[in-house]
């Protein structure tokens, strides 16, 4: 039986409160209505679109965890982070991110997402990329969502933090990178200073 508009909107608010990452398409399927109906309901209820909801959750949840750069400077939207351990961000490839003729994402956007996530996962006031080894596995097209997963895997002999980042579209690996990160609070050894030596 089809729900009344009032009941649907009440359930819509409840569903989004429980899962702010749910898409309009998933909501439309759940409530057996069109995507346009969901968008109208959201507008009437002053519920922001998915992208804004993700940013709001990130601001509330991760503002105190990301120290090396402001959240608005991260390329993509952080959806999970454990400082000095792991982080996840999503990046929706739009028209402005692709080559006009081929509709393929420009590589620097995929690199920027991975690099900024590698910086964000470092729990320090200053984190810089000292070295990056990257590999573009397959082309990413307009309309695809890239999920980047960063994991702190260790340290180099010089005390740089190693961060592995793998980016996926669905379950398919599209980009991988190993980033050596300089950080300002490197633990001092026998009177060594923590200044950067390149």
Curated annotation (Swiss-Prot):
NCBIfam families linked: PRK04424.1
Record-annotated MaoC-like domain positions: 102-167
HAMAP family with a match to the protein in the record: Transcrip_fact_FapR (MF_01814)
Key words of the record: DNA-binding, Fatty acid biosynthesis, Fatty acid metabolism, Lipid biosynthesis, Lipid metabolism, Repressor, Transcription, Transcription regulation
A Pfam family: HTH_DeoR
Record function comment: Transcriptional factor involved in regulation of membrane lipid biosynthesis by repressing genes involved in fatty acid and phospholipid metabolism.
Protein name: Transcription factor FapR
Protein family membership: Belongs to the FapR family.
Single GO molecular function: DNA binding
InterPro entries the record matches: DeoR_HTH (IPR001034), HotDog_dom_sf (IPR029069), Transcription_factor_FapR (IPR017275), WH-like_DNA-bd_sf (IPR036388), WH_DNA-bd_sf (IPR036390)
One BP term from GO: negative regulation of DNA-templated transcription
Record's keyword annotation contains Transcription regulation: yes
Source organism, top-level taxon: Bacteria
Organism whose genome encodes this protein: Geobacillus kaustophilus (strain HTA426)
